[in-house]
Design a protein with these regions (language model features):
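Residue-level detector of alpha-helix initiation sites
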Residues: 74, 135, 173-174
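Short beta->alpha connector loops at strand-helix junctions that form conserved
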Residues: 37, 60-61, 92-93, 114-118, ...
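Glycine/serine-rich phosphate-binding loop and adjoining beta1-alpha1 elements at the start
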Residues: 2, 8, 77-166
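Glycine-rich phosphate/diphosphate-binding loop of Rossmann-like nucleotide-binding domains
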Residues: 6-45, 153-249
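Small/polar-residue-rich loop-to-helix segments that shape phosphate-bearing ligand pockets
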Residues: 115-141, 147, 209-237, 251
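An N-terminal-biased, well-structured beta-alpha scaffold segment characteristic
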Residues: 2-103, 107
Length: 254
């Protein structure tokens, strides 16, 4: 099978859909890999690395004109025009974008949106949401530390004491947990809020403090349990109380 890995063209996008290691594995299975020139440069992967792994370095038209195309982001109109009808597309395709899905269908593509992969043990290797959220949580704290005008940890020196930065994390999913862990390693004091009571233990295990908002009705408690690890919309009455508690922490946060 011809497998294409084109250069991502979305503004600010630096990722690439496959690494040389992936190319090597697919090559060993008998596939022919075509990588667009400079596809991995923004991700610090050279064309030479792909060539060494067994890929052919080609132009955009040849990379997009394969039987299977691997992309990070959904193709734009110009890219769709270069893809052949009947080809397969795998990537993060934003399955909630109905117009975008219609364009893919109109182009005759069989598309697989990796965001829709179930969160099960067997599908863990395809869980792009968790892997990218992990990176986002880490980078969010690193970026915050870069913009913050003081230190994150408490420092005691002969010149005086610098208090630790106080951070509030909203949402304790994969990104939130990584943000808490990263901020804690940098020495910050963290408080976190989430609608699900089950994450309180996770927050505390990472050294953070959970912002507890008690449930006053059975409806609130049922909604907070979530489904399949995902939170559900909470009743307005609970959201009002959460807003009050979070506002107190935000006012004192750095």
């Amino acid at each position: 099978m011809l497998i294409g890995i084109p250069l991502e063209t979305a503004p600010g996008e630096t990722r690439v859909a496959a690494t040389p290691e992936t190319v090597k594995k697919l090559k060993a299975q008998g596939h022919t890999l075509r990588v667009q020139a400079s596809a991995g440069v923004a991700a610090s992967v050279t064309d030479a690395a792909y060539a060494t792994a067994g890929a052919d370095i080609v132009d955009r038209a040849r990379a997009l004109g394969c039987d299977l195309v691997l992309k990070v982001r959904s193709p734009d109109a110009a890219e769709l025009a270069l893809m052949k009808s009947g080809a397969a597309l795998v990537g993060m395709l934003n399955p909630f974008d109905k117009d975008g899905l219609q364009r893919l269908a109109s182009a005759g593509l069989t598309s697989f949106a990796l965001e829709a992969a179930p969160r099960t043990t067997r599908a863990q290797s395809m869980d792009v949401l968790s892997s990218q959220a992990n990176i986002a949580g880490y980078k969010a704290v690193i970026t915050a530390a870069d913009h913050y005008q003081r230190f994150f940890p408490m420092l005691m020196t002969a010149a005086g004491t610098v208090k630790a930065a106080r951070i509030v994390v909203l949402g304790v999913g994969v990104a939130g947990l990584q943000a808490i862990a990263t901020a804690k390693r940098l020495g910050a004091v963290i408080e976190a809020s989430d609608v699900r009571p089950s994450v309180k233990e996770q927050v505390e295990s990472l050294g953070g403090k959970f912002i507890d908002v008690p449930y006053e009705t059975a409806e609130e408690k049922e909604a907070a349990e979530g489904v399949g690890g995902y939170a559900r919309p909470m009743p307005q009455s609970w959201l009002v109380r959460q807003k009050v508690e979070v506002a107190k922490r935000v006012a004192a946060a750095d």
